[in-house]
Amino acid sequence: MVEKNNLPTLIRIFSYSILAITFVFLINNVLTVWFDWPGIKKLFSQFGLFGFRRLSTPLEGLSVALAFIQLLFYFISILLVYFYVRKSIEQTLETDAEILTKIAGYIIRSSFWAVLILGIVDFIISFMVVEKLFNEAIKFKLVNPSFRITFIHFPLVLISFIIGYFTRSVGFIWLAVLVVGSEFAIVLSRFIFNYEQAFQGDLVRFWYAALYLFASAYALMHEGHVRVDVLYTGFSEKRRAWTNSIGSLVLGIPLCLIIIFLGMGGKASIINGPALSFEITQQGSNGLYLLYLMAIYLAVFAVSMLIQFTSYFMSSSHKILNN
């Protein structure tokens, strides 16, 4: 029988374990997809475990060791969670929820700055390439997706995460204004100046997708998601806490995990595939080189929502136990 005094500790271990396992999965995904580590699926297939078919070409030597290391990461993450919870035994669920909310907020802020800066910079580059404002040597490098993404996009993403650390506000209102302004600029250039290029429409789609996916976790942080308001508004604080707790645990968290695990299930999956191949616009060098990032949007959406749903679950559990 679990004593009531132990429930907060168990909830903390359970909640942090979900996030820790997901974090390890993301690390293993990078190791498997980008660095050709075997992954734990092949390890299970090696021994025919959990219904996996045995490999036609068994793993050998270093590959087996790397696969076991990837499996070991999961056990280490659970142990770290346990020791962290035991070390901070006096910390309340509400405090944990606030910490997770800050982490989710940082991810969202940084992602906002990334799409803003990358959109503007890549728009300028595409415009100058189309209008032949670069010499042939520079143009040859800039139309190469690997060069453009590695030496321009990645550093800008890093700068965006630095900016996100020092800022505290999220400019989704400004991003919405920029989407409208970009669409308005397309109308003006098309019907007044008879000028239209693929990168103009790409920019609108790039920002528009970010606006909805990134703002989702932000709205959840500020109670902005719609429930059955006719019922919810009449609930007591305890019933609201039960609703939020069960909803997060049964609907929110599983949805995010499904997106992450299926979207990164292999090299050709919906998130890994475009990111691995540096997929760009279908318009060639006339468009923005940001299509691969729109696949990564799904991962950012799922991770930020997962963190915030876990925060929601912990804060709601705190209210239930206190009442």
What are these regions (language model features)?
Residues 1-234, 238-323:
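Alpha-helical transmembrane segments and membrane-interface helix-loop junctions
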